[in-house]
Amino acid sequence: MLLFFCIFVVFLCVLNFFTSNVLVWWSVFLLMTVVFVCLSKGSGSYVGILNYFVIQESLGLFFLVFNVFLLQFFIVMMKVGVAPFHFWVFSVTGSLYDWLLMWFLTFQKLPFLPVLVQLFDFSAFFIFLFGICVCYFQLFVLKGYKSMMVISSTESFNWVVLTCFLSVVNVIYLFFYYVVLMAFLMPNFNVKDFNFVNWEVLLVFLNVPFSVSFFIKIFVLSEVFKLDGLFLLFLLLMMFLSMLCFSLWLVNMSVKNMKMLGDNFKVLFFLVFPMMVFSVIYYFSKILLCRLDKAEFFLK
């Protein structure tokens, strides 16, 4: 069943890539709500299902009624939970656990990404940067590993969307990266909240150095710095301070030796991290070689 829904989501994502029809987009949004309800009904997360259904269908109605370009863009941002419009996310994730939470943070957002790319307006660029700062400030007041991971994932998704705006080719790369990575990680999540103190989850969702999320930030900032400004320097400072919030998690993972938390998959640990690094090196080396070839062509 899970494999079928994964293939179905990939199909919906490809469909949104190749169409700009509002009714088709709305139909995909509706189908994603149905997929989430079908996946959640066996987990007993009825509060999260109800909150998600009400929020998504209300915003879907607004998406059809308010047929204004920029307003539709903000509505889709709110539907996905892009910061700073992520205020409703905790009302859903509070009752989600295990792989279902991973699905909500990754696969559930994928079909919305092509719509955001097509509706993007440059005037909304700084809203994404403001949302990233909101996530960094919010990390200082959160309690619990689960909430920190949700906010970290939300912040990472903002960077992913910004990367897609700067290069459409990155959309395809990141799409396949998330699909392959979640195929490795999702089947191995355990019972309730203990699984969120694993090294595998830490690597993927906390943007550790030399992971894909880390490189995404570096390349986005290299493009954004062309705009120049003190706000971007402030954003870099907040990125550093946010890592201090994760230090408690890192210390706990290093010193705890409890049986119920000692379920890290060491083989997966040594497989996922090299894949992340090698995929980034290969992808961006190809881009660099293409740019060098173009430069040589123009010099000739």
From Swiss-Prot:
One of its GO terms (molecular function) is NADH dehydrogenase (ubiquinone) activity. The keyword Kinase does not apply. It catalyses: a ubiquinone + NADH + 5 H(+)(in) = a ubiquinol + NAD(+) + 4 H(+)(out). It is found in: Mitochondrion inner membrane. The chain crosses the membrane at residues 4-24, 29-49, 58-78, 87-107, 122-142, 165-185, 201-221, 231-251, 267-287. It comes from the Eukaryota. Coiled coil: none annotated. Keywords: Electron transport, Membrane, Mitochondrion, Mitochondrion inner membrane, NAD, Respiratory chain, Translocase, Transmembrane, Transmembrane helix, Transport, Ubiquinone. It is a multi-pass membrane protein. One of its GO terms (cellular component) is mitochondrial inner membrane. Its EC number is 7.1.1.2. It is an enzyme of class 7 (translocase). Core subunit of the mitochondrial membrane respiratory chain NADH dehydrogenase (Complex I) that is believed to belong to the minimal assembly required for catalysis. Complex I functions in the transfer of electrons from NADH to the respiratory chain. The immediate electron acceptor for the enzyme is believed to be ubiquinone. Belongs to the complex I subunit 2 family. This is NADH-ubiquinone oxidoreductase chain 2. The lineage of its organism: Eukaryota, Metazoa, Ecdysozoa, Nematoda, Chromadorea. The gene is ND2.
